[in-house]
UniProtKB/Swiss-Prot annotation:
The keyword RNA-binding does not apply. Residues 29-60 are annotated as: Alpha. A divalent metal cation 7 binds at C49, C54, C58, C59. It comes from Oryzias latipes (Japanese rice fish). A divalent metal cation 3 binds at C14, C18, C23, C28. This is Metallothionein. A divalent metal cation 1 binds at C4, C6, C20, C23. GO terms for biological process: angiogenesis; positive regulation of cell migration involved in sprouting angiogenesis; positive regulation of vascular endothelial growth factor production; response to cadmium ion; response to copper ion; response to methylmercury; response to zinc ion. SUPFAM superfamilies: Metallothionein (SSF57868). Keywords: Metal-binding, Metal-thiolate cluster. A divalent metal cation 6 binds at C36, C40, C43, C59. Belongs to the metallothionein superfamily. Type 1 family. The lineage of its organism: Eukaryota, Metazoa, Chordata, Craniata, Vertebrata.
Length: 60
């Protein structure tokens, strides 16, 4: 369950079950993606995705 770093390329795939674009999860089946909600510059690693973004409590 390695979080993927969207900040480097803006896109990433994570374990085949997460796809990030512009640091937002476009699809998630498990908590593997380090995706940032609106107004969040960085999310904690291991952040749990709910729907298409992580919870705002993940913000650092």
């Amino acid at each position: 369950m390695d979080p993927c770093d969207c900040s480097k390329t803006g896109k990433c795939n994570c374990g085949g079950s997460c796809t990030c674009t512009n640091c937002s999860c476009t699809s998630c089946k498990k908590s593997c993606c380090a995706c940032c909600p609106s107004g969040c510059t960085k999310c904690a690693s291991g952040c749990v995705c709910k729907g298409k973004t992580c919870d705002t409590t993940c913000c650092q």
